[in-house]
Amino acid sequence: MNQTRVFLIFAWLMVAVLLWMEWSREKAAPTPAPTTTSAPAAAQSVPGANPGAIPSAQVPGAPGQAAAQAQASATPASQRVTVTTDVLRLVLDGGRVLDAELLQFPQTKDEGSPPVRLLTEDPAHPYSAISGWASEDRNTPVPGADGFKLVGDTKDFVLAKGQNELQIPFVWTADNGVTIKRTLTVSRNEYAVRFKDEVSNAGAAPWNGYVYRTLDRTPTILSRSMTNPDSFSFNGATWYDNDKKYQRRAFKDYLEDGTLNQNITGGWLAMLQHHFFTAWIPQKDQTAHYVLSQVAGRDLIEARGPAFTVAPGQSTSTEARLWVGPKLVNLIAKEDVPGLDRVVDYSRFSMMAVIGQGLFWVLNQVHKLVGNWGWAIVGLVVLLKLVLYPLSATQYKSGAKMRRFQPRIAQLKERYGDDRQKFQTAMMELYKKEKINPMGGCLPILIQMPIFFALYWVLVESVELRQAPWFGWIQDLTARDPYFILPVINVAVMWFTQKLTPAPGMDPMQQKMMQFMPLVFGVMMAFMPSGLVLYWVVNGGLGLLQQWWMTKRHGGEPVPATTAPAPVKKK
């Protein structure tokens, strides 16, 4: 296999991958088909027991079950509470977070653009986070998600200047003497909202109940296209446990592989979209039952448990964090949650994710030095070129030597005409005699392929690059080049690289395909994020310089075609 064919295979492989991505998105239904889940019968009970026990996997219950139970108690009228910090604006209603705005992330770069709304009450695509209590016994009073009453008269909480923490207190009290105090805590420059529930039993009988935490969403219809970066990223539910690690389920085939039904200790659940995510993170030492479900067209992922039996005169507590925010690597790391870094979804495959995380770490270090994400991409490419130089040198030396013997190869092709077998045999004899390794260019490309694909997802997924400028006309590295300057430069770089690439034994069809390859890539790159095209241009430009220098240094004068061709061994 010669270098031209390797390049051709690599190029068409990329095209095939991108076309497959596009096809898979177009094939998917825009939203799940609406289904209805009825409330469970009274006989379908949860065997709540000692602290740490979890609800049965047999119960199909959803937040609606707990809400129905709560009707037996005095459910207060809607009490909307607004909480504003330096980074978040939340709207709460009992145990529901109905709306969440990310104040430091405008929707567009236009002046006065509203902030990104991650959770929303939009009737077409509602998206909320819910935390409530249910019980094994439908006669046991529980707050559900709607029974919590705000303590005090303040309905608008604002984190004041110089204040680092803000607490919002709620309470639910039953006629049997059971009280659940809920405290929500928000902190400066944090997207994790801390929930703490304290259960006290001042009654005469034990009280059984379990906490549930749910993400409930009707997925937004995306414009599925290679020109829409939002459709590149994974959109769906994810969860993590210490045994099976990171798992995920796309909205488009939400229940295709079942409803999960898995007991997990110390895990978490989330819903991801491009650049942002929402996640429930229970206590590390507590076990919950994780369930996927669909209710009236809404996709839900829920952690049920742990369950508690609280004896008279006793109390217990449980805590969780609700993350509502961007996929900022440094802030996610501060939460110290195993596997939470995987929400920056570089790949569903662990090896590719590790490569992506490593590449972003290097990119981030370069950014700290240069202070600009565009120049950080350039710096990352330079570092990768230096690290991979030994492999590239082998590739270019092999190419230079093959280019030197182009006249001989052309003579062999002319001599054997359409007899491909004899031509290939003679060419391999020539390679053997002159100590040319035709596979010398393959290994470097194969090694660089996973790096390229991982870097592709790093540039697509990293919210740090969102609306980040480079210089001049590039004011958003996650948007396409508005004037197509980088794609045109990329076409030129590929064309010159093609001219320097040796092409022994290429037939006319391959030659035509190679001539169109720069144009195909140019059209494809024209609508991709400019940060990715910048990487491709710098990487290709440096590769072109390396190849030109290696060809000049190691190529030498072409071997004249008058030299007798290598003999063909007859079998």
From Swiss-Prot:
GO CC terms: plasma membrane
Residue spans crossing the bilayer: 4-24, 369-389, 440-460, 483-503, 518-538
Residue segments, region Disordered: 29-78
Membrane-related topology note: Multi-pass membrane protein
UniProt-annotated location(s): Cell inner membrane
UniProt-listed Pfam families: 60KD_IMP, YidC_periplas
Keyword Disulfide bond carried by entry: no
Main location: membrane
Compositional bias annotation for Low complexity: 34-43, 55-78
Gene Ontology biological-process annotations: protein insertion into membrane; protein transport
The keyword Ion transport belongs to this UniProt entry's keyword annotation: no
Gene3D superfamilies recorded: 2.70.98.90
Keyword annotations of the record: Cell inner membrane, Cell membrane, Chaperone, Membrane, Protein transport, Transmembrane, Transmembrane helix, Transport
UniProt-recorded Gene Ontology molecular function terms: membrane insertase activity
Family indicated by similarity: Belongs to the OXA1/ALB3/YidC family. Type 1 subfamily.
Listed PANTHER family: CYTOCHROME C OXIDASE ASSEMBLY PROTEIN COX18, MITOCHONDRIAL, OXA1
Subunit structure, as described in the record: Interacts with the Sec translocase complex via SecD. Specifically interacts with transmembrane segments of nascent integral membrane proteins during membrane integration.
NCBIfam families, alphabetized: PRK01318.1-3, yidC_nterm, yidC_oxa1_cterm
Function as written in the Swiss-Prot or TrEMBL entry: Required for the insertion and/or proper folding and/or complex formation of integral membrane proteins into the membrane. Involved in integration of membrane proteins that insert both dependently and independently of the Sec translocase complex, as well as at least some lipoproteins. Aids folding of multispanning membrane proteins.
Protein name: Membrane protein insertase YidC
Source organism of this protein record: Stenotrophomonas maltophilia (strain K279a)
Name of the gene encoding the protein in the UniProt record: yidC
